[in-house]
Amino acid sequence: MPRRPKYERRTIPPDPKYGSELLQRFINKVMKRGKKSLAERIVYSALDIVAQRTGQHPLEVFQRAIHNASPLLEVKPRRVGGATYQVPVQVEPHRRVSLAMRWLIQSARNRSGYKFVDKLAAEIIDAANNTGATIKKRDDTHRMAEANRAFAHYRW
């Protein structure tokens, strides 16, 4: 029986421009040192660029990018008799979205270019089209889980 209490997830109010809770979570992930207005400006500018380049509604493109980048499986280390096995496990829905957002931001930061807004917009478009570094990261995670499928019976 767990000793710690089970905590409720905080409800995040939707963002003011699009009314999306998912987008508000993304803004919070982009934010550094509590500068939320800067993070909002960056994300909204990136979405404007996405709308300009694709000609589609930016929120739909963003949601498609998050959906495409979300991993279904990941590996977790499990120690059994002195050996550590990488055990494939299913990813919880909330963590799935969080990982997709984190990978999207990391990939945008690692991209070559000058402005983060442009890099983020390009990465969102790539992820929506099932290409780019974010999708590669998801595929690598799935590949690791598939390679360690033999240890799936060690799940807890």
Curated annotation (Swiss-Prot):
**InterPro entries named in the record:** Ribosomal_uS7 (IPR000235), Ribosomal_uS7_bac/org-type (IPR005717), Ribosomal_uS7_CS (IPR020606), Ribosomal_uS7_dom (IPR023798), Ribosomal_uS7_dom_sf (IPR036823)
Keywords in alphabetical order, please: Ribonucleoprotein, Ribosomal protein, RNA-binding, rRNA-binding, tRNA-binding
GO MF entries: rRNA binding; structural constituent of ribosome; tRNA binding
UniProt keyword Ribosomal protein, yes or no: yes
> What would be one Pfam family of this protein?
Ribosomal_S7
Its GO biological process annotations read:
translation
Listed under GO cellular component are: small ribosomal subunit
The role this protein plays is: One of the primary rRNA binding proteins, it binds directly to 16S rRNA where it nucleates assembly of the head domain of the 30S subunit. Is located at the subunit interface close to the decoding center, probably blocks exit of the E-site tRNA.
Q: Which HAMAP family match?
A: Ribosomal_uS7_B
Q: Which NCBIfam families match?
A: rpsG_bact (TIGR01029)
Which family does the record assign? Belongs to the universal ribosomal protein uS7 family.
Oligomeric state and interaction partners are given as: Part of the 30S ribosomal subunit. Contacts proteins S9 and S11.
Supply the name of the protein. Answer: Small ribosomal subunit protein uS7
Source organism of the structure = Thermomicrobium roseum (strain ATCC 27502 / DSM 5159 / P-2)
